[in-house]
Design a protein with these regions (language model features):
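Patatin-like phospholipase
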Residues: 1-43, 51-198
Length: 198
């Protein structure tokens, strides 16, 4: 049987369905595919799970993490958030979700503000997070080339900022939201980036 050599992994968004990625990662662990991965690109839920895979989370760790999550804690819509919608552009600030992401990052790396360049240096993986730049009306990949000193938790928060649900995120004076708005599965971008030939 021909062995599979996965070098570039692209993960789409999908809301709570993103939890299914831990099953994929279990299969990857069993087949020892993860050691050959050179880049991980993710949007929305794919950005969360792709980032955790990049920093070394195992299937068992991710499974325990998901089981411990209380999803209602990350989406708190109340009267005030509805009344302030015209100012905030979202019913939920995303603060609790960002705190959770930062905690996950710190537990594994020791640094909740680890940047794209530090991820590349420490784990030898090019992590890329897909976002929608609302200011420039275009899809972007945030990575160690475009945003080397950006903490990945901020990029993840931008990528999961579903329009009208979560407030958009400001990075370097540009306004960002869920990468899935313009390209939920940026596989063509990755193919062109690495000149992958079918």
């Amino acid at each position: 049987m021909t062995s599979i050599n996965i070098k570039h992994l692209v993960l789409s968004g999908g809301g709570l369905l993103g939890i299914s990625y831990i099953g994929l990662f279990k299969y990857f662990e069993e087949k020892n595919y993860i050691k050959n991965i050179q880049s991980i690109t993710g949007c929305s839920a794919g950005a969360i799970f792709g980032s955790l895979l990049a920093i070394g989370y195992t299937y068992n760790e991710l499974n325990s993490l998901v089981k411990s999550m209380i999803f209602k804690e990350y989406l708190k819509i109340n009267v005030d958030s509805i009344l302030n919608f015209t100012n905030t552009k979202g019913f939920e600030s995303g603060t609790n979700l960002n705190l959770f992401i930062r905690k996950c990052i710190k537990n594994k790396t020791g640094n909740e503000n680890i940047t794209f360049s530090q991820i590349q240096e420490k784990y030898n993986i090019k992590l890329q997070i897909g976002v929608t730049n609302l200011t420039k009306n275009k899809f972007e990949l945030l990575n160690n080339t475009t945003s080397p000193e950006l903490p990945i938790h901020k990029a993840i928060s931008a990528s999961v900022a579903i329009p009208f649900i979560f407030e958009p995120i400001v990075i370097n004076n540009d306004i960002y939201c869920d990468g899935g708005v313009l390209d939920n599965l940026p596989i063509d971008t990755v193919i062109n980036m690495y000149n992958i030939i079918d």
